């Protein structure tokens, strides 16, 4: 899952640059905001098959989505109108992400390609072939929007330069267990680290240096000499040699808090884990979902975590306490993706029920 980019919202009825819109307003406490209320604002319909992924444009005015019908769709947030459908992928579209300037939309597919589009017009600009790779299943942009990393059904991670489409580097572990899929990737908001998770619950943190070199800071893997079973799958922290509690099967979602101090992972074992960075010391394990956790998002102030699951629910968590304070059950299929709007006041959810739902919190505006 990708880091959120914050923006200052205009006051209702004000124009950008006006005195009202530039006046100092107190920052939103998103824990209070999402505790007060959460209401469905709009449902976007038009996908003919299940939806894997959804993303807000940086200006908060457009949604991009992709799914099993092989199309990328772009929507007007305020009206729910379908703006355009982008054609080119030949298999499920698993990931969509806008660059911070909104000029480029990157999409990844099970057809083994990453496509770059004009973020405003939807015109295709580049195709990044993944050669001998398998399905592309996650994408992450560096905070400056210059580097794009992909996770796939392959054991390595590739990073491209967005502006040129040039492949910059391939990250590949050096231990005997590095033959499993690197399915999930996430750049930290400070741009220092790249995290990735595998289909067996391994967690790896990379430091991508300006020279283009990579340094493995922590390398999780199976405990050596232990039989391969779901009871022994987990991660291993090399600093102290301690084998932690198992995280069965693959990691379905990864994200960071905005200050880059905590890495959050969600897994097929139905748990969410919080780790202190950069040493991957487990802080909390959150339970409550009854299905595979597919997506995670953190509010701009780092106080609220939202999770989406195959159990058809969306859960809101107080990150400080680990308490689940709200559960949404409005989708009728697995919820595959959730994402906050740039200002943190809206949430979009994409589901296998072929709909995208838009949610708002806080006090309801007067009619």
Model-found features: residue ranges?
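WD40-repeat beta-propeller superdomains and closely related acidic/aromatic-rich repeat-like regions
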Residues: 2-367
């Amino acid at each position: 899952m990708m880091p959120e980019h914050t923006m200052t919202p205009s006051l209702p009825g004000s124009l950008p640059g006006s005195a009202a819109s530039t006046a100092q307003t107190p920052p939103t406490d998103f824990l209070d905001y999402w505790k007060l209320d959460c209401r469905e604002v709009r449902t976007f319909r038009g996908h003919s098959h299940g939806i894997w992924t959804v993303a807000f444009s940086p200006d908060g005015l457009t949604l991009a989505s992709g799914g099993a019908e092989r199309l990328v769709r772009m929507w007007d947030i305020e009206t729910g109108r379908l703006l355009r459908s982008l054609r080119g992928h030949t298999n499920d579209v698993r990931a969509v992400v806008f660059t911070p300037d909104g000029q480029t939309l990157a999409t990844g597919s099970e057809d083994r390609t990453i496509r770059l589009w004009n973020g405003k017009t939807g015109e295709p600009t580049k195709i990044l072939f993944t050669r001998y790779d398998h399905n592309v299943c996650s994408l992450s942009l560096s905070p400056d929007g210059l580097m794009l990393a992909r996770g796939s059904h392959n054991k390595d991670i590739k990073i491209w330069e967005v502006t040129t489409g040039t492949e910059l580097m391939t990250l590949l572990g050096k231990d005997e267990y590095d033959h499993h899929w690197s399915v999930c990737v996430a750049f930290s908001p400070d741009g220092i680290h790249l995290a990735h998770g595998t289909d067996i619950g391994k967690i790896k943190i990379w430091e991508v240096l300006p020279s283009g070199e990579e340094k493995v800071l922590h390398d999780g893997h199976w405990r050596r000499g232990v039989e391969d079973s779901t009871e022994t799958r987990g991660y291993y922290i090399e600093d102290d040699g301690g084998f932690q509690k198992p995280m069965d099967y693959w990691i379905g979602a990864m994200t960071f808090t905005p200050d880059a101090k905590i890495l959050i992972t969600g897994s097929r074992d139905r748990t969410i884990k919080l780790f202190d960075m950069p040493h991957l010391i487990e802080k909390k394990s959150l339970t409550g979902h009854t299905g595979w956790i597919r997506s995670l998002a953190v509010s701009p102030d780092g106080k609220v975590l939202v999770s989406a699951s195959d159990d058809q629910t969306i859960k809101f968590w107080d990150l400080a306490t680990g308490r689940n304070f709200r559960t949404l059950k409005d989708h009728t299929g697995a919820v595959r993706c959730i994402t906050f709007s740039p200002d943190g006041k809206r949430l979009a959810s994409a589901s296998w029920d072929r709909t995208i739902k838009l949610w708002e919190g806080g006090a309801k505006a007067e009619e």
